[in-house]
Curated annotation (Swiss-Prot):
Protein name as annotated: High mobility group nucleosome-binding domain-containing protein 3
One BP annotation, GO: chromatin organization
Tissue: Expressed at similar levels in mature oocytes and 2-4 cell embryos, but at higher levels in 8-16 cell embryos, morulae and blastocysts.
Self-association and partners: Interacts with the ligand binding domain of the thyroid receptor (TR) (in vitro). Requires the presence of thyroid hormone for its interaction. Interacts with transcriptional regulator SEHBP. Interacts with nucleosomes.
Taxonomy, superkingdom: Eukaryota
Gene Ontology molecular function, alphabetical: chromatin binding; nucleosomal DNA binding
Gene Ontology cellular component annotations, sorted alphabetically: chromatin; nucleus
Role played: Binds to nucleosomes, regulating chromatin structure and consequently, chromatin-dependent processes such as transcription, DNA replication and DNA repair. Affects both insulin and glucagon levels and modulates the expression of pancreatic genes involved in insulin secretion. Regulates the expression of the glucose transporter SLC2A2 by binding specifically to its promoter region and recruiting PDX1 and additional transcription factors.
Cited InterPro entries: HMGN_fam
Sequence ranges of Basic and acidic residues compositional bias: 1-25, 39-53, 62-72, 82-91
Main location: nucleus
Amino acid sequence: MPKRKSPENTEGKDGSKVTKQEPTRRSARLSAKPAPPKPEPKPRKTSAKKEPAAKVSKGVKGKKEEKQEAGKEGTAAPSENGDTKTEEAQKTESVANEGE
């Protein structure tokens, strides 16, 4: 394996191939304008936490539609956790407050 030639020994015919000098000149496009300053990021607004919408179980589509219709009409559909009772109580209280 041949030995490397040192950069000091560039007098030979292969001297220019051995040493690769870095260019000292920059392109006109890069040197013409400085790098633009980075704009500061705008502070994000922190909104109040919104309560998630009521979750509907993913069941049969027909049942889902029936439950929504029953809720819209105001019929007293039986509820597992008693939500309909509390909703009716709130409605009666709001009606009583309006009358006063």
